[in-house]
Amino acid sequence: MANRETVVKRLVSAVNQIHRWVDIVFPELRQVFKILTCKGALETLRLFPLPADLSKLEPNDVIAGWKKSMKRHSGVRRAKLLIELAKQTVGSSQATQAYKLHLEHLLEEYDLANTQLRRIEAEAKTVLERIPYAAKILAIIGISAIALAGVLGESGDLSGLYPRKHTAASRRP
């Protein structure tokens, strides 16, 4: 589970850096996508990384790009708003190639950390299936598989613990 913590830190770092990049290069993107890590926002950043790229397009071009990677795209209204905001952006227009390369690296890091996190969590759930008492603990409302895997990873095997009744009886004088 220490590995999971490292991957989560990398994922959070990548998300924060993407937010910073958007604040510098295309701050108006937040008016179109409230959550920058939603699929639509990430695909927009992948397909049209710079406002200058977007400002040259028509709404149908943006929608065609979205359709290639998403089953449900954001719609004509959002595409029009995105293009209008790209034309009026107050973001940095200097060193655009460097910003574009930086964004590509940030998105790759985000994707890698996301993939690794999914693999780690799937493996943790697989391991929990082999632990006989894990299903009973997971039946408790509020305990997730990942939380239980973390507890068991830190504490070890809990099967040797005595039941509460037995422990209370042994304390009597």
PLM regions and their residue ranges:
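A detector of single, family-specific signature residues
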Residues: 1-173
